[in-house]
């Protein structure tokens, strides 16, 4: 498994940050590694969806758990990616620390390439966090 942690401090309220990051249908706007999202079902705070990732246009299934104003936990349930991506909102003084933690690997025979894609995922996450921060602070 590759663990990747990226965080940024956003000059805003938890409510405003949550408003932007919890709109998970908007994910491709900020996360360039996600090309397309399709919600399959929604029950309370649990969303099941199919995403198309930029890596070879692969489709993956995810189960998303929303904990309002706290975190978004995406668990990859089927496809080339195996593991989780967790986005946390951590109040800090009058700001919010937005922290993304990946615990992920490529599944099956592709597992040997996990180390290679780790830097790509980290770079994409840094760009996404920067874009989210800019959107919120504008």
Task: Identify the residue ranges that each predicted region occupies.
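Hydrophobic ligand-binding cavity/cleft-lining segments
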Residues: 1-44
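Hydrophobic/aromatic beta-strand elements that line small-molecule binding cavities or substrate pockets
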Residues: 6-8, 51, 60-65, 84-91, ...
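Beta-strand elements of well-folded, non-transmembrane domains
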Residues: 10-14, 53-57, 66-68, 104-108
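Amphipathic alpha-helical segments that line or abut small-molecule/effector binding pockets
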Residues: 15-18, 126, 130
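Short acidic, gly/pro-rich beta-turn/loop elements at beta-sheet edges
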Residues: 16-18, 29, 59-61, 74, ...
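Glycine-rich portal/gate segments that line the openings of hydrophobic small-molecule binding cavities
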Residues: 38-81, 97, 127-138
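Beta-strand/loop substructures that line and gate deep hydrophobic ligand-binding cavities in soluble
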Residues: 77-123, 127, 134
């Amino acid at each position: 498994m590759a663990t990747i942690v990226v965080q940024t401090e956003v000059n805003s309220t938890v409510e405003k940050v949550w408003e932007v990051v919890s709109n998970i249908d908007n994910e491709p706007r900020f996360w360039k590694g996600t090309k397309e999202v399709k919600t399959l079902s929604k029950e309370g705070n649990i969303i099941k969806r199919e995403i198309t990732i930029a890596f070879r246009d692969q489709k993956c299934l995810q189960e998303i758990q929303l904990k309002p104003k706290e975190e978004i936990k995406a668990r990859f349930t089927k496809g080339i990616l195996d593991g989780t991506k967790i986005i946390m909102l951590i109040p800090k003084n009058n700001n919010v620390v937005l922290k993304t933690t990946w615990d992920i690997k490529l599944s099956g025979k592709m597992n040997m390439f996990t180390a290679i894609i780790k830097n790509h995922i980290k770079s994409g996450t840094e760009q996404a966090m920067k874009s989210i921060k800019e959107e919120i602070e504008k």
